[in-house]
Amino acid sequence: MASSGRYKVKFRRRREGKTDYYKRRIMVISGKPRLVVRFSNRYVLAQVIVSAPQGDFTVAEASSRELVKKFGWLGGTGNTPAAYLVGLLIGYRALSKGIKLAVLDVGLHRVTKGGRLFAVVKGAVDAGLEVPHDEEVQPSEDRLNGEHIAQYAADLKQSNPELYKIRFSKYLARGLEPENISKHIEEVKSKIMEKYAKSEAKAEDSQ
């Protein structure tokens, strides 16, 4: 941190709103892996990071882009259901690397009760990863299952078919009727769980 007179220039990443060094120091000192969740304009990204004297190491990583490429996800890549599925994926991957607990690292993002951040946490916890948090901040099951999207789509389709086609054009182009998104979420969730169940079975057989 540079200084001149009474004014101190903050570290670049703090000025850019990327790193809270005070919170980061506390988490690094704890020695526990960190569950880092970030959002871009289109995607959800989750990482499990371990800090060492040499620097930070990414142990596991998952993104909503992978949901499309590897698990056939047809829904939006930045919404609450996608965030939940990313959490499920990062949870299984962390466990496969021997990580059983991770501390949530929200960076400088504003924490909102029931938001996408906690949808990721819920997914990771459902996978079996321990992430200390208050369960009251988790999104409702209706939002995790996409029922709010399905209901809105069904109502809009009936009241304004043209707007329905415009609003859900990407869903429809991929072959998914948004009214059926809850069923699709369960299908993708099953694919993720099945993949890692097989991975665990192979690991046990090799021992």
Swiss-Prot record:
The gene is rpl18. The keyword Cell membrane does not apply. InterPro entries: Rbsml_uL18_euk. Belongs to the universal ribosomal protein uL18 family. It holds the Pfam family Ribosomal_L5e. NCBIfam families: PRK08569.1. GO terms for cellular component: cytosolic large ribosomal subunit. Keywords: Ribonucleoprotein, Ribosomal protein, RNA-binding, rRNA-binding. This is Large ribosomal subunit protein uL18. It comes from Caldivirga maquilingensis (strain ATCC 700844 / DSM 13496 / JCM 10307 / IC-167). HAMAP family: Ribosomal_uL18_A. One of its GO terms (biological process) is ribosomal large subunit assembly. The keyword Disulfide bond does not apply. PANTHER family: LARGE RIBOSOMAL SUBUNIT PROTEIN UL18, RIBOSOMAL PROTEIN L5-RELATED. It comes from the Archaea. One of its GO terms (molecular function) is structural constituent of ribosome. Part of the 50S ribosomal subunit. Contacts the 5S and 23S rRNAs. This is one of the proteins that bind and probably mediate the attachment of the 5S RNA into the large ribosomal subunit, where it forms part of the central protuberance.
